[in-house]
Amino acid sequence: MATAPRPRTTTRDPEELVRRLTAWLGTRLPGARVGGVAAPASNGMSSETLLFDLVHPSAPVSACALRLAADPAAYSVFPVYDMARQYRVMRLVAEHTDVPVPRVLWLEEDPGPLGAPFFVMERAAGRVPPDVMPYTYEGNWLHSATDAERARLQDATLGVLARLHDQFPAKEARFLTEPGTGDPLRRHVDAQRAYYAWVVDGVARSPLIEAAFDRLEELWPQDPGPAVLSWGDARIGNIVYDGFEPAAVLDWEMASYGPRELDLGWTVYLHRFFQDLTVGFGQPGLPDLLRRDAVERRYAELTGHTPGDMEFHTLYAALRHAVVMLRVAYRQVHFGEARVPEDPDTMILHRASLEAMVRGTYWPAP
């Protein structure tokens, strides 16, 4: 998969999309033109992103990005794309913290103009650790950096998480609480169970994912800790870097209200996902980047909060990623790019890692 073509993600006509976007922008800035249109080279297969230049003498910015809810005909990754929610989160993060987020410009909740709700934001300049091919492979800027430069990037990235969790008022994030009963962590996991049920509705279920849910219950934290604003898709592939410093934090569609460790577990495991794949293809990868022990130690230094139950939270991250990967695999089947194997667990790219986590053998004994 790491060397496979990127799965199809849309059925939209890009020229038609640009034409309709130009017409819509004309209602905000009469005479506005769209130029320099491009799609990001990597990172993200859920909401669609279109990069463009806004040409108008009164434009608030010239370099823009459009975030458009997924095309339902494209067998979307998630059942709901709440663009207004993302827009609100980004606006609030900018208002309450010094975390660098792109300036949001316009929100359109009416699906009429472009076929789905969307928002427009300022486009950040910089570079992003790639997903395809992953930054853990040779031949990209992060892999080519020095150890000191990668350490600087890691420290700055953990600083983003620390400031987000510390500076954002928890009460302002409560609108992100998942429905249901129980504390925020219980509601979060229950929502993931519901998402998994949606993914496997009418198709083969995953015994491994279900075993991972069972293992979560065995590892359930005695004290999940206070809830904060969780970025959600908290990984370096969703940050634009200026050199090795974060310039813009992107992709807030998974934002939620829950323990700090939700983001920490995701950050650690999503790097391990790429690292394990890279090692499996015979390359050393970046084994010293975002090590779990280093992340826990530095986060505690920055915030005074010692991360707890990280075996639970890294397992939960791997489980959540498995559900997403299963949906992506079934989307490839939908578009005729793949067939359903006899064992559906083979569609989970990190099957071996998740199996080891379920057994309790993935992380070395302390």
Can you say where each PLM-predicted feature lies in the sequence?
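Juxta-kinase regulatory segment immediately upstream of eukaryotic protein kinase catalytic domains
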Residues: 2-31
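ATP-binding pocket architecture of kinase catalytic cores
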Residues: 38-211, 219-220, 224-226
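Conserved catalytic-core element of eukaryotic-like protein kinases
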Residues: 230
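Conserved catalytic-loop position in the HRD/HxD motif
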Residues: 233
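Activation of the activation-loop gatekeeper triad in protein kinase-fold domains
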Residues: 250-255
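Helical subdomain adjoining the active site within ATP-dependent kinase catalytic cores
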Residues: 305, 309, 320-366
